[in-house]
Structures are given as structure tokens and as C-alpha cells.
Swiss-Prot record:
Protein name (Swiss-Prot/TrEMBL): Elongation factor G
Biological source species: Rubrobacter xylanophilus (strain DSM 9941 / JCM 11954 / NBRC 16129 / PRD-1)
One annotated GO biological process: ribosome disassembly
UniProt-listed SUPFAM superfamilies: EF-G C-terminal domain-like, P-loop containing nucleoside triphosphate hydrolases, Ribosomal protein S5 domain 2-like, Translation proteins
Single GO MF descriptor: translation elongation factor activity
Ranges of residues in domain tr-type G: 12-309
Amino acid sequence: MAVQVAKKTPLRRVRNIGIMAHIDAGKTTTTERILLYTGLTHKLGEVHDGNAVMDWMAQERERGITITSAATTVFWGGIEGSAKNGKKDSQEGRHSRIPEQYRINIIDTPGHVDFTVEVERSLRVLDGAIALFDSVAGVEPQSETVWRQADKYRVPRIAFVNKMDRIGADFYHAVETMRQRLGANPVPVQLPIGAEADFVGIVDLVEMKAIIYKDDLGAEWDETEIPEELRERAEEYRERLIEAAAEHDEEVMVAYLEGEEIEPDRIRAALRKATLELQITPVFVGSAFKNKGIQPLLDGVIDYLPSPLDVPPVRGKTLDGEEASREPDEEAPLAALAFKVQADPHVGKLTYIRVYSGTLKAGSYVMNTTKGVRERVGRLLQMHANTREQRDEVYAGELVAAVGLSNTSTGDTLVAVDDPHPIVLEQMVFPEPVIDQAIEPKTKADQEKLSQALQRLAEEDPTFRVRTDEETGQTVIAGMGELHLEIILDRLTREFKVDANIGKPQVAYRETIRRRVEGVEGRFVRQTGGRGQYGHAIINMEPHEGGYEFEDRIVGGVIPRDYIPAVDKGIREALESGVLAGYPVVDVKVELVDGSYHEVDSSEMAFQIAGSMAAKEALKRARPVLLEPIMAVEVTVPEEFMGDVMGDLSSRRGQIQGMDSRGNSQVIRAMVPLAEMFGYATSLRSRTQGRATFTMQFDHYAEVPQNIAEKIAER
């Protein structure tokens, strides 16, 4: 499919969005339909007879467009030859009310809990999102997690209540669960007409009219009066909508109080403002599978979600540690963030980049300020639904995939080589893996292949780690859950053709400290004929939320600048294996405060060892404790098994957080240590005759009770 790309879309007409959803809320279908209709708009310019359009859609549907790309670009609105020539009622003009063409970049976000990192990473680079909900289930556990992540990044959202054709579909219940379980402020801008098999259309509350679909492909519909039986409800919801708009717009408030009729455009502008301020979530409704409600949803993306100009400038620090920010302006200095690395069979390593400011040119050199290395940008590729397009340059606010960045990984910042004030954008913080598995190749010949493949996979995915166990010499892989590691193993055989044996999943314990220690010394001196070795470092160490931090507080050159990174490296090495049970140490801050060196005998190696010695000693003194992953568990269970299931969770050291009823089942929410959850699926099945289901996802690390910690340390 050839894609006509406008040379440059003004920033106000760009939308960078993601579709966030629970695993089965219908995300793939919704995304496919969006690609279908946006692809269709290109065809519509050429095709002036409705049948051809219908044929094309049927074909496209049979072929099924799927996204394998991390960012896909589509266009919507401003169809040539339809809205522009006044044929508003002709077939084509009905697809979008929007008179100009907008560029929508869709960033793919996975729905499974083991991939929260993927969601975090996409939320970081998108400006707005569509939150998808299943009209039967309403808010599900994963929807809550993703919603909380989107709150953290302050991402404005619109909601789409999908699957209105399903048995048990209940739009109003779904909206209520958004209010109760997410603490959101949902404002329906549409209501469904009918439900389940009788779902035939939508009431547009802004324009106060009904859209009744005439065909299965969602390409033809009639705009009519609102059905009599829905009139009263529509007026009640319209009233709420206007109130929500009035709260955020004084002119609308005045008009509302004086009982004036308010123009739809004015309402949309007020709702847009409230959405961008995260005060409300406009709610749309439809059935992607039945092709209903997708075009109005796309109009909603343009009406209510932000352009790069509507979000605050991206923040970071200069190399001196001063706060800095970059405005979304192509004339400004380049600042770009690599948000995903993907192995691609055709071009090798693809690095997906969001350009926040300035212009990125193919073939140019850039500086990776996170790592302090120069990189050459090879080709720049714009991904569309099923084609790639080469770009010579990419501007602020855009997303692109780059070929040739060999040293750049997820979360790295790229700036111009000659930038006098380079910036390092805020780093992405990824959760610690919670599950370990030993892995070995089936044949000795595969050893080299296996370690290369694992290295490649670890590059792509920051929550997947590979390490060698010091005591056993085994290779250990770690990830966010059993499914995560299963998929990694599947990719090993499928993409890298490596067969491996794996051990049983183990809990990935961590160690940390509980008190500050000062003036801890590491001194490495070796005098054996010829040149000696001399390294001496004095550190303070303290507990520190949010990972490892190293602070250089050396004054007066007592340790030369060149050796300071070596001390940091030595400390990091020491933290890989804690003093209690050899697990990695997390959440500590180390200050390098003093030390000494020898003109002749000092070397990087000596200071690395000194740093490592100081850190090991500090860990012993700083009250080390063992941490274990605690999982948020949700069990959906028929009433009669409630007591039994709750008793079982408590016996697994679980803490019950609360209960809800959902339909005729009860939902129990609990925090349970991962160590107690192995084999839970089988146990739950036998306790409830297979009628209960559960989901679990990592929530936080917590201190292991003393008696259990002692047993773990003895292993």
C-alpha cells in the first residue's frame, strides 16, 4: 500500500497515542480497525463509488492488518474530494467531521501483566491514550495497573467501551467501574443504542443526534433523531456533559447558567481543556469487531487528545546536573529518546526514537549523552500499517525507527554532536525482575550461540536480565513472571534456533540495607617485585529509594578524576552479590568522600578493587536485610468457596486488601509473597472445582520475615 505522506504535518495536527487495555478488551481488533479506516481514507480520495470501498475493506479484513511495529503512522481527516467539495452527505464525507488531515502515531502497548515494562516505556513517549474497556467486565486488574502508570506519567486519556455486541454488555456498569475502581471522572460523550445482538448504533451527546449503522462494515450509517425510548436518558447525560464542560470553561458556564444553546464546537473545546488537565475522561462506545464506533473514536482522538504542543516541555539535566528542558520546536537543538530496541530480520537492530525537539537527519552523527558515545544514524524508517517509508529527516514531535545505532539502548538520550549545552533526558526506571531460572544449552556447541542470543534479548528488554551465578557457574535468566520467561525461551528456539534446558523457576530475592554507615574504607595494596598496586577509597552508604546512586564528593584531587569511574564500577560489582545470601543489592546510595593514591602504583584496576572492598564492608555494617517480591493477586471466585480461598491465601502469608462483588462472583484482592504462589493455579482449581480464576502481578519488594530469611540464607 503506497502511503501519501505530507512533507510535514504542523505540530498542532500531530497526535502521539497509545491504546492501553486489559489483555482481552479487544485491542488488536480495535487497532486493526483503526488501520483499516485510516488506510481507507487514502483510498477514498480515488474511489468515488461506494461499492469499491466496500470490496476493499472486505479484502483488507480477510488479509487482516496486524502491527508488529512499535510505532505506526496513520492519517485521519481532511479527505480530498469529500468534505472539501461540500458533498457532506456523500459516502466519503461521512467518515470524519475533521476538515484537515492529522498525523496519528500509534505506539503499541501490550496488555499482559508480565510486560508492564513495555507499557511504561510506551507511556513515556506518547502524549495521550485511548483506554479500552470490555463492556461486560468493565475495569479489570490489568486496566488498573495501566491506569496507574498513565497517571504517573500524566497522560490524558479518552475511554472506549468496546465489545457492545457481547452477551452481558453493560455500558453503564463499565463506566461506573471506571469511577469506583480507577477513581477516574468518566464523562460519556456517546451512549449505546441497544446492546448485545441489538447494538445498532450510538447517540452522539455533543451533537445530540443518533448514528444508526446500516451495514456490517461500519462504512454506511444514517444520522437520525435520537430514539424516543433513549431521549430522556440522553438528555440527562447531555446535561452532565455540559456541566463537566462548564466547570472548566467560564464562557460555557455563563451560557449554561443563562440557558443558552451551546455550540458543539464550544463544548468540544471545553471538554478538550478538561481532558488535557486530566480532570475528565471522555467515554466513547462501540464494537470494534462489528466495525461500529471506530470513526467517531478517531475524531475523538483529534478532538480531545493532546498534540506535542499541549504537553509540558520534556525535562532532563545538563551534563553538570542542572535542570533543563526542551520545547517541541524543530528549530531548537536536537533532543531525542530511544524508547525501544528491536531485532529486525531485514535490517538488524532497529532503535525506535521519539524526537522531542530539533531535527534528526539520516546519515548524521549524534551524541548519546547517557553513555557519552558518538553514534552514526544510518537510515530512518517511518512505519505504516504494512509498509515502511524511508525518511531523510524527522522533526520535533515525531516517532521514527533508526538503523545503525549500535551502542544505544532503551532510555538513552540522543543530541547533536555540536550541541554546546547537551541534555540528558530523564532516565526510564524499570522494575527489578521477580523470577529466576537457570538455563543451559542442550549441546555444548550451542553455548556461544545461547549467550549471544540472551545478550541480544537483554538489549531489547530492560526487565530481562542475564547473569552468571558465582557459586554454581550456571547462567541465570530473570524476568517479570513465568509467561515472560516462556516467551523468551520461545524466541530463543524460533528466532535464534537455540535449544536450551531450563531449571525450575525460583524467586528473585534482593538484598538492601536499613541504616546509614560512614567512613568505610577499602584499601588495596600489593607490593610484589616491580610495579605495585595501590587503591584506597572511603565511602558512606545509605538506603535510597529508586535504585543505585553514586555521588562523587572528592575534593582537592585526593583521588584523581580518571579513577573515580573505576571506584563506581567496583561498587556496582560488589552490589551484584549481597552479604546475606548472595542476591543482588538494590536501593542504596554511595558517596565517595575520601581516599588516597600513589603516583606510580595506582591504576584503574586497583581502585576498582578498593571500591568493591569498601562496598562489601559497608554492606555488612549497614544492617542488611533480605527482600522478596510481593504480588498483587486477584481471585474471582463463586460465593460458596469464599471462606476456603481466603483461608488459603492467609496461610500463604497473604494480606487480604479488600473484596468486591462482580456479577455473581466475589473478587478477593490480596498481597501475597511470590514464594508462596508457586503451584497456586492447581491448588485453586481443586479447591473451587475449577470455577475460580486468578491474576497476579508484581507490586513491590518487601522485607522477608526473620525466620524465613534465615532459612533462605542457609540454602
